[in-house]
Amino acid sequence: MASEPGGLVEIWTDGGCKPNPGAGGWAAVLRFGAAEREMSGAERETTNNRMELTAAAAALEALKRPCRVKLHTDSEYLRNGITRWHTGWVRRNWRNAQGDPVANYELWQRVLAAAKPHEIEWIWVRGHAGDPMNERVDQLATAAREAMLREPAETSTARR
């Protein structure tokens, strides 16, 4: 999604699995002024957290130039990882506070790389609490997961 330098892009993301771990879907809606773009995808074997990270990474990777971004997520894992935990992980060579390797390391790297050129405000919203855009991305992620489950087992999808 193209934007003017300094323009504000609003992004809503969601990811989920049923069961967790299991088949999962992710989705994002990007809004720049009156323009909107929906993105979604799914994987057969994944986790809620992996789908949340994938949604954020894919949305940020879709931006064609540096932007101001408000990214809305109902994932405390994503928001806390980006705003609080990742500096410690990097300092400890991608180990958590207990000394174990950080889960989903490659996806955290992808999110951080995609976020780097942008000025991002990470906004947590309560899931399933009636926020219209959060409900929309939840429905898109669920639809992506359900569509993938109707396909042959060797495929995963990414609809962009």
From Swiss-Prot:
Pfam families associated with the record: RNase_H
Catalytic activity reported: Endonucleolytic cleavage to 5'-phosphomonoester
GO MF: magnesium ion binding; nucleic acid binding; RNA-DNA hybrid ribonuclease activity
GO BP of this protein: DNA replication, removal of RNA primer
Keywords: Cytoplasm, Endonuclease, Hydrolase, Magnesium, Metal-binding, Nuclease
E.C. numbers: 3.1.26.4
Entries under PROSITE patterns matching the protein: RNASE_H_1
Residue numbers binding Mg(2+) 2: D14, D138
Key word Nuclease present: yes
Cofactor: Mg(2+)
Classification via InterPro entries: RNase_H (IPR050092), RNaseH-like_sf (IPR012337), RNaseH_domain (IPR002156), RNaseH_sf (IPR036397), RNaseHI (IPR022892)
Family, per entry: Belongs to the RNase H family.
Primary role: Endonuclease that specifically degrades the RNA of RNA-DNA hybrids.
Protein name: Ribonuclease H
Organismal lineage: Bacteria, Pseudomonadati, Pseudomonadota, Alphaproteobacteria, Acetobacterales
Gene this chain is encoded by: rnhA
